[in-house]
């Protein structure tokens, strides 16, 4: 049995402080054959988590320690400047660029009664770390094989 207690959280945060990325994860899966992701993630202010999405899975995020904001975005596809009737074949699924605009910011802080969130599949998101924090996160699919995309 493994106990996730104050001592373990403190150790994980110390490891994050020594990591140049200012974060450290701890894999909670019991086997590499497990087709899911379940982990603890220690995050320090200043860490950069790129805006990303998981097209095929929701992401469950529970804050165990600290304070952070889960930031959600909506994608606006930007066209290529070609007007209908120009005689050039248009491919509506191939936008030249994209613009993301913030749609929600969920501040998780156990002292204020906010403990976590579920990010819908396909939603662009990131986190802003407001205090040293540890989250439990889970989603479907093996890491690196789940179809995740970054901006």
Regions found by a protein language model. Give the residues of each.
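Glycine- and acidic-residue-biased ligand/ion/polar-headgroup-sensing regions
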Residues: 56-78, 92
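Conserved short histidine dyad/triad with adjacent acidic residue
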Residues: 40-55
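Double-stranded beta-helix
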Residues: 4, 8, 13, 96, ...
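A short, N-terminal "cap"/entry segment at the start of jelly-roll beta-barrel domains
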Residues: 1-36, 50, 81, 92, ...
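Short, surface-exposed charged micro-motifs
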Residues: 40, 60, 126
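Short acidic-glycine-tyrosine-enriched beta hairpin
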Residues: 75-85, 89-122
């Amino acid at each position: 049995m493994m106990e996730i207690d104050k001592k373990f959280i403190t150790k994980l945060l110390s490891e994050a402080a020594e990591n140049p990325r200012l974060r450290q994860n701890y894999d909670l899966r019991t086997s590499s054959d497990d087709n899911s992701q379940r982990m603890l993630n220690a995050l320090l202010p200043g860490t950069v988590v790129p805006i990303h999405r998981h097209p095929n899975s929701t992401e469950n995020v529970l804050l165990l320690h600290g304070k952070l904001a889960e930031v959600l975005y909506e994608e606006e596809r930007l066209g290529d400047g070609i007007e209908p009737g120009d005689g050039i074949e248009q491919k509506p699924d191939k936008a030249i660029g994209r613009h993301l605009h913030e749609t929600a910011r969920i501040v998780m802080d156990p002292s204020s009664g906010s403990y976590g969130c579920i990010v819908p599949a396909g939603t662009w998101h990131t986190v802003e770390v407001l205090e040293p924090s540890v989250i439990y996160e889970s989603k479907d699919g093996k890491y690196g094989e789940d179809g995740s995309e970054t901006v």
